């Protein structure tokens, strides 16, 4: 008998045993009206799982943004869209959450992660710089910025060297300019990468950071010879 009950149960779609997003969102509205904020947030989390886009519409049209529950709802939407890999939407709601908590390091880091996922690398750099301004020991930010400045510097150095090699018979002035460009690049790029990666090593024994620092040391020797 139990086996037949299990077979019959498996034949019904799960939606028959779960609440739809619109039902959950009506309950969210009722919970908010009665002051049950914790329950409202819990219901909203369930509604995100049931239908994230319907929950999003509820947030934009029904939620009072001046209430304390608004940032909690924004967080639920951000985390839901991140979980389902809709990084554009997740980024939108982490940015929304920053409107409520602009100096929250965890939110800034999540926002930067989504910027990287969305291909907004320059924006991620700016966001991670905000992070280290608030928390100089943030491992993720230091690691990203160290790698960012190193890779950018490598690209710039290759261009400087390629341009110089195009000169069949460089003059003293052209050679001096070439050396000066390398020196300026080291000061503006490689040195920043080194500072961030050295900070990484004080926080975590990263072999990759150590290898990159060795490469920077070789570049410095070449620049200063």
Each predicted region: which residue ranges?
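N-terminal leader/linker segments that initiate helical-solenoid repeat arrays
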Residues: 17-61, 65-72
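Canonical positions in the second alpha-helix
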Residues: 47, 96-97, 130-131, 200
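Short coil turns that delineate tetratricopeptide repeat
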Residues: 52, 68, 102, 136-137, ...
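TPR alpha-solenoid repeat register
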Residues: 56-58, 73, 107, 141, ...
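Short coil/linker segments at helix-helix boundaries
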Residues: 58-67, 151-196
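Canonical tetratricopeptide repeat
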Residues: 59-62, 76, 110, 144, ...
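Short coil/turn linking the two alpha-helices of tandem helical-hairpin repeats
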Residues: 117-119, 146, 151-160, 221-224
């Amino acid at each position: 008998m139990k086996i037949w009950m299990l077979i019959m149960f498996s034949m019904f779609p799960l939606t028959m045993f779960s609440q739809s997003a619109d039902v959950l969102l009506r309950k969210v509205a009722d919970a908010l009206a009665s002051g049950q904020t914790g329950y409202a947030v819990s219901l909203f989390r369930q509604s995100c799982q049931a239908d994230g886009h319907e929950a999003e519409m509820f947030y934009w049209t029904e939620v009072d943004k001046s209430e304390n529950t608004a940032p909690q709802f924004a967080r639920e939407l951000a985390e839901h869209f991140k979980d389902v890999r809709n990084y554009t939407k997740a980024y939108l709601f982490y940015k929304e959450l920053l409107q409520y908590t602009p100096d929250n390091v965890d939110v800034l880091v999540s926002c930067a992660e989504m910027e990287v996922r969305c291909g907004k690398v320059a924006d991620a750099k700016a966001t991670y710089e905000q992070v280290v301004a608030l928390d100089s020991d943030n491992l993720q930010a230091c690691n990203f910025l160290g790698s960012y400045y190193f890779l950018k510097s490598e690209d710039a150095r290759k261009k400087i060297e390629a341009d110089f090699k195009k000169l069949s018979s460089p003059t003293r002035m052209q050679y001096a300019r070439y050396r000066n460009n390398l020196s300026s690049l080291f000061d503006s790029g490689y040195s920043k990468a080194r500072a961030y990666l050295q900070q990484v090593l004080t926080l975590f024994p990263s072999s990759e950071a150590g290898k990159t620092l060795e490469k920077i040391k070789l570049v410095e020797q070449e620049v200063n010879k």
